[in-house]
Swiss-Prot record:
It comes from the Bacteria. It is an enzyme of class 2 (transferase). Keywords: Carbohydrate metabolism, Glycogen biosynthesis, Glycogen metabolism, Glycosyltransferase, Transferase. The active site is at D405 (nucleophile), E458 (proton donor). Belongs to the glycosyl hydrolase 13 family. GlgB subfamily. Its EC number is 2.4.1.18. GO terms for cellular component: cytosol. It catalyses: Transfers a segment of a (1->4)-alpha-D-glucan chain to a primary hydroxy group in a similar glucan chain. GO terms for biological process: glycogen biosynthetic process. It comes from Yersinia pseudotuberculosis serotype O:1b (strain IP 31758). InterPro entries: A-amylase/branching_C, Branching_enzy, GlgB, GlgB_N, GlgB_N_E_set_prok, Glyco_hydro_13_cat_dom, Glyco_hydro_13_N, Glyco_hydro_b. This is 1,4-alpha-glucan branching enzyme GlgB. The keyword Transferase applies. The gene is glgB. One of its GO terms (molecular function) is hydrolase activity, hydrolyzing O-glycosyl compounds.
Amino acid sequence: MPVLPDRQVINQLISGHYGDPFSILGMHETSQGLQVCALLPDAQEVWLVETENGRRIAQLTLEDPRGFFIAQLTRRKKSFRYQFAVTWQENPQIIDDPYRFGPLLQDIDSWLLAEGTHLRPYERLGAHLMRLDGVPGVSFAVWAPNAQRVSVVGDFNFWDGRRHPMRLRRENGIWELFLPGIEAGQLYKFEIIDCHGQVRLKADPYAFEAQMRPETASLISPLPDVVKSSAARQKANDLCSPVSIYEVHLGSWRRHTDNNFWLSYRELADQLVEYVKYMGFTHVELLPINEHPFDGSWGYQPLGLYAPTRRYGTPEDFKAFVAKFHQAGINVILDWVPGHFPSDEHGLSTFDGTALYEYADPREGYHQDWNTLIYNYGRNEVRNYLAGNAFYWMERFGIDALRIDAVASMIYRDYSRAEGQWVPNYYGGRENLEAIAFLRYTNKTIGVERPGSVTMAEESTDFPGVTLPPDIGGLGFNYKWNMGWMHDTLNYMQCDPVHRKYHHNLMTFGMLYAYTENFILPLSHDEVVHGKRSILDRMPGDAWQKFANLRAYYAFMWAHPGKKLLFMGCEFAQGREWNFETSLDWHLLDDENGWHSGVQRLVRDLNHCYRQYAPLYEWDYQPAGFEWLVVDDHENSVFAFLRRDAEGHELIAISNFTPVPRYHYRVGIPQGGHYREVLNSDSAFYCGSNLGNQGGIDSHHVRSHNHEHSLLLTLPPLATIYLLREN
């Protein structure tokens, strides 16, 4: 007779409340020989089969009608490889027992995961297709240290949490199990009995693929292969290279005209890549494509950080989409959100019954602006989950850069909080020291492990050293969005031209701090939503003046120090605000001679001009690359400045922000010579009035603006011109 486990243990195991299934299930060496136990609800008959020869060794006895089987092999003392021959409702099946396999995580992995320094936690946690002891299947692992029991549930076991409880690795709180015979494409979740005894059904935080909303299950999917970077892609991210970014929301750039449905990743690869290349942008920036439950969040409330959203296709489709951009010589930036996550029940919130991924105190862990939860950056495992995710997108999909969203909300404990609604740090300050340490670690890791890949911060305050290296006290980002420049210049452009002279400093103030960080000048999605109106609609005047103002502003921006970013639709002056539920208004370009087509041609030429002339980008972050020529002509609302590259080539940008043409306008210049007009935003080609300097002009030896040489120019109304000094 077999020695039965304690009846209470059997009851707990069958009811799904026993936390150590490997101590009962599987094959165990006892003083009376080998004992084999199995929990197979609904099985009618179970035989033990020796894998090596296929011989049936013994029939297991049904000790509990709820599916608990046991066999005692008194003549066998040493464990051996085995299978079960199971009869289900008269259907025979040979299965491998998940409980015959040993621990999965290696000691080094356990140590690194607990320490929070595992470079690739996604290689160990989550669901992984593999062969173990020659048996194909999937290894599952999930961090839930306070859970009483965790099971894998899915299509393969009727979503029954009793059937496949997992092994707890007590040294790190990770539950693991290898399930033989499971294949890619099957649905799964983790059924967790939390520390309070409540049952929770959770999606896999490390899932590589997830169901399309509103469904919430994870999909078993292979870990994507490594994508190597290239010298060309690395150079394209450099501070001395031209960086012109086209920001895109994949779900609304263009849609199917017959049903308003999204384009797939592969359809976008065919259409978007060609368009971005035609327009001359060097980079494309994608609003978050991590899996997210709510369309209206635009992806900024992600739950599946490791899964490209199923809205547009599979991970393989997304990988092909990125590769298509790389083939076209365009780098890909991904908006990344490590600052907060939604509180959906199937997600990370109270994962094991405790505030595991989030701060427990709502003054730290709840984001009242967005009704989301804030990651607990003080936990090693949470930092590892996030930092590993950043590296994952770069290593496994070839993402060239990450733009980190809402950095200010991460690094300040009092962000958008009134007095008494936040918790000071250890020193009594307002900085979130844990978040700062996390950002420094992540940026430094990317710099070391993925050379040439960069990070960009959307940071809206004056926090010092955002783009300084962590070793000297900085956050370690490569670039920072210049929100101040964007707000100031847009406020200026919204003024009626007659009043602009009173706000002249709004256009010049940015140069006072332009070299404190490595800035990107952003006209992003945030500026064309929530009643702010489109960029075009903010411009004053009648239709002609609105378009002229916009063209002049874009040309001013492209000449100004700092890399460029433009949200989709702005490149052809879409008149309405962005709507994530519909396509851009491409019909505005039907008239090739219309104003919208003119703006599109201008942006295309600005990009090509920007990439062609090194003075416009090479010394973006060197004071020697910029010089004001006319900075104080507020009466005429004229600005003139010079851009210079490392070899001494010079390009002059002059803007007239009034509708009054300025004839015989003299501008002092450092060097005399012939200056060719390489761009004029008032050109008839862009639907302007076609006033200019007839292609070029020679300087005069006439002193002006503290220079010995000068140019006598015609400044078109509401326009910006570029003049290139020819050797």
